[in-house]
Structures are given as structure tokens and as C-alpha cells.
Amino acid sequence: MIYKIIDIPKINNTKGNIGVIENDTIPFDVKRVYYLFDVPSGAKRGGHAHKNLKQVLIAISGSFDVVLKDGKSKEIITLNRPDKGLLIENNIWRELENFSSGSVCLVLASEEFSEEDYIRSYKEYLHFVK
């Protein structure tokens, strides 16, 4: 398996539930947080790997599919619950697709942005992971 699902602690309340992410929820120090929203119908995001950075993706609203490849195997994971996070380790190719209308993908990253950490060509990625 080239990924791990993380349970996000949830506080149930009749007025609305609360998802709680604290230091021990995520297996790394979070150095950057961003989110994807208003993704047009049929659009894909991702299409890259990271040499060092790790991420947790959470479907805060709606749903989307995450296609993960490690050069040998391929997994497709549907995210559609705000109390489940998808841990993606470094050196894993990822593509996000099939975004539902109004979906929001929250990303927690282990590192700040660095273009040098990206592998943006799948051919280059396959060479890198050999």
C-alpha cells in the first residue's frame, strides 16, 4: 500500500461537528497549509511528485479522487469525508481528479514551497524512483 488513511478526531455536536487537527494527529510538523477550491468540472490537479515533502489531503467539502503511483503500482482513493485524511509520503506521484461541484481539498504539507522539490514529468519521476 502506497498511502495511509488518517482518522481526524471529530467532536460530534447537535449544532454541527468539529474536526480537530493537533500536533499528534499528523505524523509530521505542518509547515504549510493550502486548499484547492472552485476546481472546474473535468479539471485535474497535481500531476507531480515531491522528493522530500509529505502531505495530508482532506476533503473538507464534496469529493474527489486521488490517483497515486509509485512506479510499480497504482491506487485510486476517493476522499469524501472531512474526518479522514490521506497521507502521501515523498516520492509518490499524485493526480487529483473527478472533483464534485463545491468540493474543497485541504492540504497539510511537511515543508514550505520549494520548486526544487517537485518532479513534474512522469518520465523523469520513473527514472528518479528506479
Residues of each region from the PLM?
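Well-ordered alpha/beta subsegment
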Residues: R81-G85, N91-E97
